């Protein structure tokens, strides 16, 4: 049986820490930035760690060998 492919969308959007947590970039930066304060824009920079349930769902449903 051939190897399963990883979903390309997940490969591009998420990274994983050594302990298995899922890292994603902050959402809400594409448009409507004029109505946000400078502090809100500043806080949206960088990445965030997803909550455990979201990370579990990413690994279980979108990665072929994510959850053993």
Swiss-Prot record:
Q: Which GO terms describe its biological process?
A: translation
Keyword annotations from UniProtKB, A to Z? Ribonucleoprotein, Ribosomal protein
Listed PROSITE patterns: RIBOSOMAL_L35
Q: Does the keyword Ribosomal protein apply?
A: yes
Annotated signal peptide: none
One GO cellular-component annotation of the UniProt record comes to: cytosolic large ribosomal subunit
Instruction: Give a GO molecular function annotation for the protein.
Output: structural constituent of ribosome
State the Pfam families in the record. Answer: Ribosomal_L35p
What's the superkingdom here? Bacteria
In which family does this protein belong, per the annotation? Answer: Belongs to the bacterial ribosomal protein bL35 family.
Give the matching HAMAP family: Ribosomal_bL35
Under the heading PANTHER family, the entry gives: 54S RIBOSOMAL PROTEIN BL35M, LARGE RIBOSOMAL SUBUNIT PROTEIN BL35M
State the protein's name: Large ribosomal subunit protein bL35
Q: Which organism is it from?
A: Rickettsia typhi (strain ATCC VR-144 / Wilmington)
Name the gene behind this protein.
Answer: rpmI
